[in-house]
């Protein structure tokens, strides 16, 4: 009921825009309903989606931190980049 009201309002705005010469809205994309007004079926929901994201992001962060730490140690051991103590103004 509410969705059909929204579709009607958009159609009115679309027709009003074309009458005044505005071609901003060319096509109405219906995400939730078919042209007949029937509701589309619910999309497939992946179970444990948030858990999958967490199980993907956390190992990626840990691996990235390990690689960064190893690279920093390598650069410091080979004297390619040694942080100077003059930059520390924590007195």
Swiss-Prot record:
The keyword Transmembrane helix applies. It is a single-pass membrane protein. Its main location: mitochondrion. The chain crosses the membrane at residues 45-65. The keyword Kinase does not apply. GO terms for cellular component: uniplex complex. It holds the Pfam family DDDD. GO terms for biological process: calcium import into the mitochondrion; mitochondrial calcium ion homeostasis. InterPro entries: MCU_reg (IPR018782). Belongs to the SMDT1/EMRE family. PANTHER family: ESSENTIAL MCU REGULATOR, MITOCHONDRIAL (PTHR33904:SF1). This is Essential MCU regulator, mitochondrial. It comes from Aedes aegypti (Yellowfever mosquito). The lineage of its organism: Eukaryota, Metazoa, Ecdysozoa, Arthropoda, Hexapoda.
